[in-house]
Each structure stands twice: as C-alpha cells, then as structure tokens.
Amino acid sequence: MTSERSIPEPVTAVLEGAGAWLPGELARVEAGLTEIIDGLGPLAADGAATLRAGGKRMRPMLVLLCAGPGGGEAAVRAAVAVELIHMASLVHDDVLDRAPLRRGIPTTYATAGRERATTLGDALFSSTFTMLARAGDLRATELLSFTAVDLARGELLQREGAYDLGLTAGDYENRCRLKTGSLFSAACVLGGEAGGAGPEQSEGLADFGRGIGLAFQLLDDVLDLAGPPERTGKARGTDLLDGTVTLPVIRAIELDPSLAVVDLNQLDEESVAELSDRIAATGALDQVRAEALAMIDRAKSSPALESMDPEQRRLLELVADGVVQRYS
C-alpha cells in the first residue's frame, strides 16, 4: 500500500536549500510511516487515507534538522513517532469536533464513522509506543508519553472553555502550550538529543520548538477567521461555530468590548461570517499576527541555535520563517 503525496511548503523551501542528506532522511521517515500504517490490519486503508491527506510534516522536519546529518536511525525513528502521535491526535480531534473535512479532504470520522475513527486514533498511538519499545528507545517513549498526556490535557481545556468569551490570553496560551507547543517541543528535543545535544542545549531546543508551535497556532487561528476555504480546507469561522475561543477573539473583545455579549451558541454560517468581519475590523487579526511574528523572532534568536553548525541553523530558521510565509 503506498501513500503518495506532494511535498508541501515550508518543507519544499528547506529541501531546496539542504544537502543530499535531508531528502534521504525524509524519505526514510515516509517509508517508516507507511510501514506502520500497513501493519494496522483492517484499519490500514483508513490509516493510509489519513497519511495521504498529507500535512506539512513540520514536526518530522524539526526532528531531523535539530539532529543534523549525524542523527541516524534514532532521529528517523523519533520523526516517525512524532508524526504518528500528531496523526493520532488529529483523528481524535476530528471525532470530538465531528469534523467532515481536514485540509479539504473528508476525515475518517466522516467516511468511516465515530467508532472506526476513534479506533484508528487509538491504534496510531499504540503503534507509536510499540515501535519505540521494540527499539528500546526509553527516552523517546518517556517524552512522548508525557507529550500525549499534554495533548489530552490541552484538548480537555479547549472543551471546558468552549463558548466562554471570558477566557483570557493566559488561558489560551496555557491551552496551546499543551495542545500544540508540547509536540513541537518534543520534536526538537528528540532531534537534538539524537544529534548529541547536551542538557542545556536540549532545554533551549524545547523552548525553540514550543515558540514555533505557539506561533503556528496563533497564525492558524488567524487564518480560520480570515482565510478562504480553498486555502484552509474548512469553512471560515469554523472555530467560532465549534465554540472554540481563540486569541484573535480574545484580542478583539479587548479592543471592542461589545463583542463579549455575542452568544456563540446561536451562530450559523451567515452570522459567523458577519462576526468574523467584526473581529477583523477591530484590528485584532493584525495584532495577533504581530505577536506570532515576535514569537518566531525570539525562537530564531535562541542560544540553542547559536551553538549549531551554521547550515543547520539556517535550515531551522527557514522552517521558522515558513510558518509565517504560509499565512502571509
């Protein structure tokens, strides 16, 4: 069973500027993902469809780049594991959200139903830790176990805060650190350690990854309100319809307190478009974009990158810049 896919931005830009080692390692990651998916038995077809749906492969890219050319099998294995965890979490998110589409493609939830999609997510999580256990990779097993718990905690915070326009920026950041930043952070740490990073540099790489992840989430939330469906793969204002309160909404309420009385439970496709326009009119989207850009700049100035090989650092900065370019 194959999983052909086009290589997305910002990965293409990095590949064009990298040496021969990086495309080869990414190909090994794709082969590893396909091998795991093919081993899922009756769920293999559903898993292959999820894999073919693609994505940016930013997390595996971060693993490989933080490891550098000497990361070897440990880096490839970590990259596969990180992407499998990401895939599993998305499948479960789609079940919780009752999402018909992801990246413009029907979800497993939509095509196969709640039970099968839930089981696929469970199988992806389990397969990740089976692979790591067989390799005796205790470090990756431990870190990704903690990360999986963080993902669940972040998802729970999102559910508990649904439709609550009283959420603060601090509430939002805490949720996103768990739900998004934790896996980016783990990717950078596992990659760095595969490449020989010591404790101090690993800590710096954790902060770098977390910063990239938070910026990624901020810009994704901006795009939900501003981006056309053909670009986002979902209807505009989907987060609002789901009751998910994001930083652009929080900043908009700070700028226009009259928005705080909106009843998100009463939104439909027409009224959500009007509300999205009202939020944009406050200037909140530009403010959140600026906050995300500042996060990217801070991440790129991390001391953990300063001690790297210049070419390795340049490629990591390309990935960071790619987060911004995708939303420009």
Regions found by a protein language model. Give the residues of each.
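Conserved N-terminal diphosphate/IPP-binding helix and adjacent helical/loop segment
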Residues: 1-87, 91, 95-110, 158-166, ...
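Short acidic/histidine-centered micro-motifs embedded in hydrophobic/aromatic stretches
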Residues: 49-50, 81, 98, 143-150, ...
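All-alpha helical catalytic cores of prenyl diphosphate-utilizing isoprenoid enzymes
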Residues: 34-37, 52-54, 119, 133-229
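Acidic/serine-rich, low-complexity amphipathic helices located in mid- to C-terminal regulatory regions
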Residues: 123-131
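Alpha-helical phosphate/pyrophosphate-handling elements in metalloenzyme active cores
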Residues: 40-84, 124, 169-212, 248, ...
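Divalent-cation-assisted or electrostatically stabilized phosphate/pyrophosphate-binding catalytic cores
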Residues: 102-124, 165-180, 206-207, 229-255, ...
